[in-house]
Amino acid sequence: MRQFEFFEHTADVGIKSYGRSLEEAFSNAALGVFEVITDTSKVRPVEYREIYLNGYDLENLLYKWIEELLYYYDSELMIFSKFDLMIDQDSITLEGKAWGERFNDKIHERRTVVKAMTYHQLSIEKTESGYVITFVVDI
């Protein structure tokens, strides 16, 4: 199963992520966002940030998840490449760790700055093989 793919969107970037579980799909959504920013294959998982979030539905939880990761990029220049998550769909909570390192011009390619997550075209679909998440980020 592929992790994520990009799709055409006027002036922004559309991302479709996949996962056998909801946690894997959320992780791949985050990986897709950071792939817009840099080559995630060069991001070493040397530091982590613990993340605890709750939402009013799964789409809101995804929105908060991506925004939280972008907050760490904006405030600490943290870029991430590995995620360990647990999502409770009954209480609509996410808890986990995002692993990565601080952006370093000598190691990491500077691609496009992702300004924010959006609700535009945001959907989370359960399929026979797992989950498909579709969303757009503002660049």
UniProtKB/Swiss-Prot annotation:
Is Metal-binding a UniProt keyword of this protein?
yes
Q: Which residues are involved in binding Ca(2+)?
A: D12, D138, I139
Gene Ontology MF annotations = calcium ion binding
Q: Which InterPro entries match?
A: Archease, Archease_arc, Archease_dom, Archease_dom_sf
Tagged with keyword Metal-binding: yes
Q: Which SUPFAM superfamilies match?
A: MTH1598-like
The disulfide bridges present are: none
**Gene3D superfamilies xref list:** Archease domain
Alphabetically ordered keywords of this record? Calcium, Metal-binding, tRNA processing
Swiss-Prot/TrEMBL GO biological process terms: tRNA splicing, via endonucleolytic cleavage and ligation
Supply the PANTHER family for this chain. Answer: ARCHEASE (PTHR12682), PROTEIN ARCHEASE (PTHR12682:SF11)
Instruction: Name the protein family.
Output: Belongs to the archease family.
Tell me, what does this protein do in biology?
Activates the tRNA-splicing ligase complex by facilitating the enzymatic turnover of catalytic subunit RtcB. Acts by promoting the guanylylation of RtcB, a key intermediate step in tRNA ligation. Can also alter the NTP specificity of RtcB such that ATP, dGTP or ITP is used efficiently.
Could you tell me what this protein is called?
Protein archease
Which species expresses this protein natively? Saccharolobus solfataricus (strain ATCC 35092 / DSM 1617 / JCM 11322 / P2) (Sulfolobus solfataricus)
